[in-house]
Amino acid sequence: MYDILPPELWIKIVDYSGEINLLLTSINFFELFNLVDVKVNVIEYIIENELIDVLKHIVVLKNLKHPIMGKNIISIESLNKCLLDSCNKGQLKIVQHLINIGANIESNNNYAVLLASGGGHLEVVKYLVSQGANIKSKNNRVVGWASQHGRLEVVKYLVSLGADIRSNDDYAVRWASEHGHLEVAKYLVSLGADIRSKYYYILCGASQNGYLEIIKYIVSLGADIRAYNNCAVKWASQCGHIDIVKYLASQGADIRNDNDYCVGLASKNGHIEVVKYLVSQGADIKTYNDHAVKVASKK
């Protein structure tokens, strides 16, 4: 097809249409990138359309130090952006080719390995590590991110490389618990993670988000359910998690703490079943000058 018309005409056709599809159909057409005036981001277009063979060809050209690679048709900014997107999606082959072309795995504080870890893409994580990615950057944020997203196998791998699960005030177990990832939380605790970190924020976060099994597990370890001024039952009441409110109350949480603040929060947010339960347990809806009644009447 390339030989049907002289290169000059192909260049005019591409410049007029603004489309680069044609240039990606053969080696001869690809050479015309030196001569055309297109506004399309080449590497992003290639990645979005998963044109693996084109990526392979670019790797070959780079290794050969072909003149076309010096024409800025592919910027380092585009490479790095596409690398992050591919790591997030777990596209190992694309990640490998992008790095071979020149994408920087350490850009944005090793954000590539963080995204791959959060996405649970273990093979991508392993490859990035083999290429020098730093799993301990930003105070071991990578293992915390994997924990937050419930990626147990990734967490185990990172730990095997020396990731510090206790950094950042036990960030890993706090976020695993707050997001309901029980198996990750158990694993981290087995390695020494402290459930009491940050005034039992684990318990409060799990209560706020409605993760009863996490709460039961933490309580089984001896957590103080009244910690941080009974924040757990307050947040559960505020968010309408009736089963958690009942469980915490059964374990000794003070539902009347702060002048019946729980019933006020439940009323404010329209959680009638929680309000009924709290009242049945002795909560006074008239506390704070009928605050609960006034707030509920405004909804």
UniProtKB/Swiss-Prot annotation:
Q: Which UniProt keywords apply?
A: ANK repeat, Repeat
Q: Does the keyword Transcription regulation apply?
A: no
Name the InterPro entries for this protein.
Ankyrin_rpt, Ankyrin_rpt-contain_sf
Pfam families xrefs:
Ank (PF00023), Ank_2 (PF12796)
Which regions are annotated as ANK repeats? 78-107, 108-137, 139-167, 168-197, 199-227, 228-257, 258-287
Keyword Aminoacyl-tRNA synthetase annotated: no
Q: List, alphabetically, the SUPFAM superfamilies matched.
A: Ankyrin repeat
Give the matching PANTHER family.
ANKYRIN REPEAT PROTEIN, GH09064P
The protein, known as: Putative ankyrin repeat protein R864
Q: Which organism is it from?
A: Acanthamoeba polyphaga mimivirus
